[in-house]
Every structure is written in structure tokens, then in C-alpha cells.
């Protein structure tokens, strides 16, 4: 007898099955009866593999007043995510073996959902030590560092025969600094978008592509925000994957007039003529929330002083399911971009698919649920969103991590999140 049977699971348009779970793993998928000590009837719902957010900032350690691993992971569970990958820019950053290991211990102590970690990059001397902990990637910010420094990371990974991808924030530092200097006397929110123009992103993408091709090493480009940047990436899919965020997908630079600094983010929201739309999703690998919470008083500062970032974990699935209800995307696209591809790109071999032998991670959704997005219902410490009041159709009703429900009907329950080491096989480009 198994631990758990999930019954009447609609896992595809025309396929309903029962799923047996034992010791946190999927052990049987059948249309027949499954004996289990606990049964959950999911008739009327749609069951996806547990969703994976490959781009979150939980601010822990050092900036816990913004978010920490407990509140961030609760927000993830509330939003329908069973696994997250946290970025390294904490205080201190996770850019050496000691701090990387410390962050693992923090997550294991606090997290409700499973998690992996992106490593920061400080110097080539730290790379080998971090590799022992099997990071999801090494993250670099091109707006903060030079091309020669990043080239050193590529060389070190190649010398160590380590197929760990380099994840990149693409904005050219020189273009940004020049533009900001020219616009520093303006105080209107729209000036920020002009200070980090599409050219900064596109030049940086081209530089990173050159490094990836030269070293024959995998690269993942975060939060693409312009069509031209996407066009640059497309011919080089052997080594390069890419991501879009919900705010770049659903908002444009006109949102500055309504929301001001609440929508300040890097890269900034783009004009309608250059932004990425849902119709482009078949050309992009994953959707990452870039969940980047801050204190509300920080976000109310002036355009040059307010920190960039938008909290998205608890809204993205509702927003995407609303697009599904309008025929602008499909459930199979959600499954690909928020489960299958993040697991493949970042080496989460036991995640991302509903199949025997995989972790028993599931996101259960009600396609008929309707409502309005309310930030006062968030589990995140960041109780604000530019999507406040948006009407939605479809939402998560249960999040299951290794056979354990960590969210039911909007209530987050106790969890036992684990660190998931990444197992990279070097097959990084588009599947």
C-alpha cells in the first residue's frame, strides 16, 4: 500500500489518471485503482508538474526585512510553485564556498518548498569550491562588471570541464552609465526607462553570445525585454537559453505613469513597439518571476533612489491562466516554461515531469476560479503589486512537494523544503 493516491488527475486535455505516491516519489500512474493510506480526489481540477521558478530573490541572509527564505517560500507555495532557484545577491553574496554552504543551511532550516541556488561570481579562485555544492548556475550582472571578468569565469569553467551554465543579467555598463549621466537631472519615473535603453540590453546580449560561442559554454539570459534581444539569441540555441518575466510580458513603459517607482525594475519596462508579447512565448525557454521584494517605503522613494524589483510569485500563475482562458497561451506552454524547461536547463533531474520515478511535486489548478488580485493576501513581506485589482480566471488550489501538500485552498501549510543539487549534463540548448 502506498502513502498517497491522487485520484482523477486530469494531466492533459484528454487524459485523466490516478497517481500513486510513496516516500515522496511517483511510483505508479494508472487509470485503475491504487491502494494508498491517504487519498485525495482531484476531480474537476487540472494537475501540472510542480512548477519551478528559476529566478527569485529571497534576500536571505542580510536583507531579511525585505523577504526571507520562510516568507519567500511561503509565497512560492501560495503561488503554486513547488521549487525555486534563489539568486546570489544577498548580504554577503553567495559567491564563495562558505557563503554558498551557509545559504543552503538557511534554506533547509526555513523553506517550505524545495530549492536550488545560483552562485555568485567574485573570482576564479572561488569557482572550484562552489562547484562541490552543485549550483544551478553562476550568475553575473553585466551592468556591474566588465566583459573581461566574465570571460575569466567562462575560461575557469571550461578548464574544470564543468558544464554549469552562466546565467546573465544583460545590460551593458558603459551604455547605462552614459545614459544615466545624461538624464540625472530628470525626476519623472519615465526617465529611468530611457536611462537603461534597449541598446544597453542588446549590446550586452551580443557580448555574452560571443563569449558563449567562443568558449562553447552554455548561457542562460535572464529577463529578455526587447524583441531585438530575442532575435539576437535565436540563431544560437545550441548554447543559449532565455527567460521572460511576467512584468515584461504583460506591462509596458506606460505603466510608469500609473504606478511610478512601483514598476521600477532592471531592465525597465519597454515601449509597446519594442516589448515582448505573449504571442512570442514559443520562442522563449522559460518564464521566471524575478520575484524581487523590497520594503514599501523604499519603493516610494524618488526614481533614482527607489530600488528596482517587483514581487511576482503570488500573481504569475493567475495571470498566465487568465491568458489561457482568453486563448492567448496554452496549458502545455505553462507546463513547458514553468516546469519542464527550468528542470532541464538547471539540472533538476527529479523535477519538472509527471512520470514514475520523479519527485511527487504537483501544482493543482482550478481553471474556473475567478477573482481579483489582492496584495493583502500575499504571504510575501512585499504587500504591493502593479497587478493589484487585476481580474483573473484560473488559479492554484493545491501545491504538493514530494507528496506533501504545502498549500491547500489558499492556505500555506508546514513544509520541509530540501536543497536540490543541480546535475548538469552539458545538453543545455533548446530541447
Curated annotation (Swiss-Prot):
The keyword RNA-binding does not apply. The keyword Hydrolase applies. Pathway: Pyrimidine metabolism; UMP biosynthesis via de novo pathway; (S)-dihydroorotate from bicarbonate: step 3/3. It catalyses: (S)-dihydroorotate + H2O = N-carbamoyl-L-aspartate + H(+). GO terms for molecular function: allantoinase activity; dihydroorotase activity; zinc ion binding. The active site is at 290. GO terms for biological process: 'de novo' UMP biosynthetic process; purine nucleobase catabolic process. Zn(2+) 2 binds at residues 139, 169, 223. Binds 2 Zn(2+) ions per subunit. Zn(2+) 1 binds at residues 55, 57, 139, 290. Keywords: Hydrolase, Metal-binding, Pyrimidine biosynthesis, Zinc. One of its GO terms (cellular component) is cytoplasm. Its EC number is 3.5.2.3. It comes from the Archaea. The modification N6-carboxylysine is found at residue 139. InterPro entries: Amidohydro-rel, DHOase, DHOase/Allantoinase_Hydrolase, Dihydroorotase_CS, Metal-dep_hydrolase_composite, Metal_Hydrolase. Catalyzes the reversible cyclization of carbamoyl aspartate to dihydroorotate. HAMAP family: PyrC_classI_A. This is Dihydroorotase. It comes from Methanothermobacter thermautotrophicus (strain ATCC 29096 / DSM 1053 / JCM 10044 / NBRC 100330 / Delta H) (Methanobacterium thermoautotrophicum). The lineage of its organism: Archaea, Methanobacteriati, Methanobacteriota, Methanomada group, Methanobacteria.
Amino acid at each position: 500500500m502506498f502513502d498517497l493516491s491522487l485520484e482523477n488527475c486530469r494531466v492533459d486535455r484528454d487524459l485523466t489518471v490516478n497517481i500513486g505516491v510513496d516516500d515522496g516519489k511517483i511510483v505508479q500512474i494508472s487509470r485503475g485503482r491504487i491502494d494508498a493510506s491517504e487519498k485525495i480526489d482531484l476531480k474537476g481540477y487540472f494537475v501540472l508538474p510542480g512548477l519551478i521558478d528559476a529566478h527569485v530573490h529571497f534576500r536571505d541572509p542580510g536583507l531579511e526585512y525585505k523577504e526571507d527564505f520562510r516568507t519567500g517560500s511561503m509565497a512560492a507555495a501560495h503561488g503554486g510553485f513547488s521549487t525555486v532557484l534563489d539568486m546570489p545577491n544577498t548580504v554577503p553574496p553567495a559567491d564563495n564556498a562558505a557563503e554558498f554552504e551557509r545559504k543552503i543551511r538557511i534554506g533547509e532550516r526555513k523553506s517550505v518548498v524545495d530549492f536550488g541556488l545560483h552562485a555568485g561570481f567574485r573570482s576564479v579562485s572561488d569557482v572550484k569550491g562552489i562547484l562541490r555544492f552543485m549550483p544551478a548556475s553562476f550568475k553575473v550582472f553585466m551592468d556591474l562588471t566588465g566583459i573581461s571578468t566574465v570571460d575569466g569565469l567562462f575560461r575557469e569553467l571550461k578548464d574544470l570541464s564543468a558544464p554549469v551554465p552562466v546565467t546573465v543579467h544583460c545590460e551593458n555598463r558603459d551604455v547605462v552609465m552614459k545614459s544615466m549621466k545624461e538624464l540625472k537631472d530628470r525626476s519623472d519615473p519615465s526617465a529611468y526607462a530611457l536611462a537603461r535603453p534597449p541598446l544597453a540590453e542588446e549590446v550586452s546580449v551580443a557580448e555574452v553570445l560571443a563569449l558563449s560561442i567562443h568558449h562553447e559554454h552554455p548561457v542562460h539570459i535572464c529577463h529578455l525585454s526587447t524583441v531585438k534581444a530575442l532575435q539576437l539569441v535565436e540563431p544560437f540555441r545550441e548554447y543559449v537559453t532565455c527567460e521572460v518575466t511576467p512584468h515584461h510580458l504583460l506591462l509596458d513603459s506606460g505603466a510608469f505613469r500609473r504606478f511610478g517607482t512601483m514598476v521600477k525594475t532592471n531592465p525597465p519596462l519597454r515601449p509597446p513597439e519594442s516589448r515582448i508579447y505573449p504571442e512570442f512565448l514559443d520562442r522563449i525557454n522559460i518564464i521566471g518571476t524575478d520575484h524581487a521584494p523590497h520594503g514599501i517605503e523604499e519603493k516610494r522613494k524618488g526614481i533614482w533612489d527607489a530600488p528596482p524589483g517587483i514581487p511576482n510569485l503570488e500573481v504569475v500563475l493567475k495571470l498566465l491562466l487568465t491568458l489561457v482562458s482568453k486563448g492567448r497561451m496554452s496549458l502545455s506552454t505553462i507546463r513547458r516554461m514553468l516546469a519542464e524547461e527550468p528542470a532541464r536547463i538547471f539540472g533538476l533531474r527529479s523535477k519538472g515531469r509527471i512520470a514514475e520515478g520523479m519527485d511527487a511535486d504537483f501544482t493543482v489548478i482550478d481553471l474556473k476560479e475567478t477573482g481579483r488580485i489582492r496584495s493583502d493576501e500575499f504571504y510575501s513581506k512585499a504587500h504591493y503589486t502593479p497587478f493589484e485589482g487585476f481580474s483573473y480566471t484560473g488559479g492554484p488550489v493545491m501545491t504538493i512537494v514530494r507528496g506533501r501538500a504545502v498549500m491547500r485552498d489558499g492556505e500555506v501549510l508546514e513544509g520541509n523544503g530540501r536543497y536540490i543539487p543541480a546535475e548538469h549534463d552539458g545538453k543545455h540548448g533548446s530541447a
